[in-house]
């Protein structure tokens, strides 16, 4: 999922790629680690077959600085590469290419807004086949509300909850990733089918 600043396209899964994917686990805690496990499983099962890493962040590397930089001290971008990376790029690229082929064949210039809707969700603005803006940010936690993830909110919520509950930043961060979103709001499920069923049963939340 997360290729950070290192990958703007797919890459052979060699030692360099593995090291970068591992380095970027904090930016995609639900995904990068699991993908490394899968990579090693394939490598052990099929040692003579090559592996390629396809990064969900790669498609969004065409964004301009004014669209991916955060309004925080610039040194954090320079030192730690803190910026908007986006996600679901493979999906957004497929949607934009398919829409162009089906509906915009004769258009040299075109604008498309794509939506990736699942337990994780994001939107992207695409101009002439290139991403110019997307909703997810540094990690897949940002953007619109999702199945178990918060999406965007006031950054001070983290500090406030740590102070009020005595929980660590990591504990609250895990709750933002695994216990929030539709699940957190509804108290029922992250699955819209369960939430709809709850609605018809009179569950107000």
Regions found by a protein language model. Give the residues of each.
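Non-transmembrane, aqueous-exposed alpha-helical and coiled segments at domain scale
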Residues: 12-15, 33-38, 45-48, 107, ...
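A gly/proline- and charged-residue-enriched helix-loop-helix capping module
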Residues: 20-38, 80-82, 89-93
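Glycine-rich phosphate-binding loop of actin/hexokinase-like ATP-binding domains
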Residues: 62-162
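Beta-strand segments within the central parallel beta-sheet cores of soluble alpha/beta enzyme folds
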Residues: 111-115, 170-178
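Adenine-nucleotide phosphate-binding core of ATP-dependent small-molecule kinases
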Residues: 174, 181-185, 192-205
């Amino acid at each position: 999922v997360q290729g950070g600043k290192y990958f703007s396209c797919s890459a052979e899964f060699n030692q360099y790629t593995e090291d970068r994917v591992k380095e970027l686990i904090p930016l995609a805690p639900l995904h990068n680690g699991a993908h490394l496990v899968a990579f090693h499983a394939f490598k052990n099962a099929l040692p003579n077959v090559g592996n390629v890493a396809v990064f969900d962040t790669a498609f969004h590397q065409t964004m301009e600085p004014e669209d991916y930089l955060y309004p925080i001290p610039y040194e954090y971008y320079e030192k730690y590469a803190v910026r908007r990376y986006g996600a679901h790029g493979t999906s957004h690229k497929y949607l934009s290419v398919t829409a162009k082929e089906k509906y915009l064949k004769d258009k040299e210039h075109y604008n498309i807004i794509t939506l990736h809707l699942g337990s994780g969700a994001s939107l992207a603005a695409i101009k002439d086949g290139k991403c110019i803006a997307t909703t997810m940010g540094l990690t897949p936690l940002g953007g619109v509300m999702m199945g178990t993830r918060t999406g965007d909110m006031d950054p001070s919520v983290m500090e406030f909850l740590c102070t009020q509950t005595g929980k660590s930043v990591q504990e609250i961060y895990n709750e933002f990733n695994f216990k929030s979103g539709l699940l957190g709001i509804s108290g029922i499920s992250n699955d819209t089918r369960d939430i709809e069923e709850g609605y018809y049963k009179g569950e107000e939340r």
